[in-house]
Amino acid sequence: MSVIQTPNGYKLDNSGRRVVVDPVTRIEGHMRCEVNVDSNNVIRNAVSTGTMWRGLEVILKGRDPRDAWAFVERICGVCTGCHALASVRAVENALDIRIPPNAHLIREIMAKVLQWHDHVVHFYHLHALDWVNPVNALKADPKATSELQQLVGPNHPMSSPGYFRDIQNRLKRFVESGELGIFKNGYWDNPAYKLSPEADLMATAHYLEALDIQKEIVKIHTIFGGKNPHPNFMVGGVPCAINMDGDLAAGAPLNMERLNFVRARIEEAYEFSKNVYIPDVIAIATFYKGWLYGGGLSATNVMDYGDYAKVNYDKSTDQLKGGAILNGNWNEVFPVDAADPEQIQEFVAHSWYKYPDEAKGLHPWDGVTEHNYALGPNTKGTRTDIKQLDEAAKYSWIKSPRWRGHAVEVGPLSRYILNYAQGNQYVIEQVDSSLAAFNKLAGTNLTPKQALPSTIGRTLARALEAHYCAAMMLDDWKELIGNIKAGDSSTANVEKWDPSTWPKEAKGYGLVAAPRGANGHWIRIKDGKIANYQCIVPTTWNGSPRDPAGNIGAFEASLMNTPMERPEEPVEILRTLHSFDPCLACSTHVMSEDGENLAKVTVR
């Protein structure tokens, strides 16, 4: 391969200098990225690779379906809960189990707590340092920082010059100690960083504030699910009873005091996303107003299943509607059916798996998980020490899911594009007001269709979705209290708990709007045991390698045509890949074409 044109509109040229970033980060294991840059340091080819095999689908075969949630929840320790929820929904769908209204509301609150928490932690503690230079904050004027805070977030109480001076002094002592800790190995002199010292100081202060609030919001999981991470779920409902006269002993049922605690944490989250998170994203974006790279597939093909039904089992009441948009046509949204084998298929032509016919895709109900680790003839290195992958062959442990044959992007940005296009008034007001604030500060006149499909737009969508989730949680809490006051304390339906009540064979699916995008689990049950289990998680969609037709996935597409200041300091690669929300910090090595180490960075 030198230059090829993909069916989904990308011109790939791997003749230029190769830069390898390995690992970038992880969601279910590690991710590697290789790019080719031309003589102007513009990315002309991108290769995204999942470098660890999960294998949970194999582990689950022959197990009790009622236990599946506890296994799949361990797929990830950060997006904790969304896989468990998808699993219990899949089993309930297969066995035609309907959960009580209170169980639905409690699950909704737990799911939205995860969404809010994950988005806040992602932005402040994983992604912000791709935009924010904390060392530069030492040059800031605390008084000017206070004025900036009043301009972009006037309702935030911690905004005095003295407050920012204290933060700056703490940061100064940290830097002068020579132990930068979480800020070590950053490219702080890279010209890709554009913020003023005052904006850097404000964002660094909020980085620290977010550390405090994120540990408070997850206490809701401990109340409803017993712990965090990995709260408990159950097929048929939720594992927490309601008794308004109960005490506060460990393991006691929910009472009003605990429910009031839940409401207080939701209200704190609502205020933080409104007064800090969203204003921060808008303020930071104004310094990067010309950096509208990274849109990739979000400019053309997006997909989601929809979630957060106001009335359980009625998809028409989803507060974030699903669907698919192709070719950037926001005027036409196609329905998505997870049960349709013509719509959702996974391919393995470039994945380290075997299929009976690798030119064809398989629906998850018929999915096969048989590993086949084989490197292409143009791979540089060995099986255990790869220097450069051969993207013309198999090169990833991630399969290639496609919707009606199309590579699509999933995630909060996809959900917001879909809901803006479908007239969701809450989403429209959020997007329009945020873009108006951005245009005013930046002196631009961007439309939603110009601004959203970008790395910055992807980051903004997460902030807006976090706040929407906080607003929905308040409604869920009020409805739950109303049910309890009306005498309804049911939280589980155990009519079909006994496997003797199940059919000999059954199949089902469970769908969740996970923090990183469309999350689906498909199950086949035979003789009371799991016969087949397949997950298509958000990073499977976004991080997929090429399919048999040559279409590239969302990660690869998002990097195309991005200019880099210094390829040996891949700020731009990390910035865009992190906008998809990688989960955990891990060490990153950057290597030249012959494998020589050029730099080492710790991705935060």
UniProtKB/Swiss-Prot annotation:
State the top-level EC class.
oxidoreductase
State the needed cofactors, names only. Ni(2+)
Q: Which InterPro entries match?
A: Ni-dep_hyd_lsu (IPR001501), Ni-dep_hyd_lsu_Ni_BS (IPR018194), NiFe-Hase_large (IPR029014), NiFe/NiFeSe_hydrgnase_LSU (IPR050867)
Membrane topology category: Peripheral membrane protein
Subcellular compartments:
Cell membrane
Could you tell me the keywords of this UniProt record?
Cell membrane, Membrane, Metal-binding, Nickel, Oxidoreductase, Plasmid
Q: Which GO terms describe its cellular component?
A: plasma membrane
According to the record, cofactor stoichiometry and binding are noted as: Binds 1 nickel ion per subunit.
Q: Which amino acid positions bind Ni(2+), per UniProt?
A: 76, 79, 583, 586
Q: Which PROSITE patterns match?
A: NI_HGENASE_L_1, NI_HGENASE_L_2
Q: Which GO terms describe its molecular function?
A: ferredoxin hydrogenase activity; hydrogenase (acceptor) activity; nickel cation binding
Q: Which reaction does it catalyse?
A: H2 + A = AH2
- As recorded in UniProt, its EC number(s) are 1.12.99.6
This protein's assembly is summarised as: Heterodimer of a large and a small subunit.
What exactly does this protein do? This enzyme recycles the H(2) produced by nitrogenase to increase the production of ATP and to protect nitrogenase against inhibition or damage by O(2) under carbon- or phosphate-limited conditions.
Q: Tell me the protein family, please.
A: Belongs to the [NiFe]/[NiFeSe] hydrogenase large subunit family.
State the name under which the record lists this protein: Uptake hydrogenase large subunit
Task: Give the lineage.
Answer: Bacteria, Pseudomonadati, Pseudomonadota, Alphaproteobacteria, Hyphomicrobiales
Q: Which gene encodes it?
A: hoxL
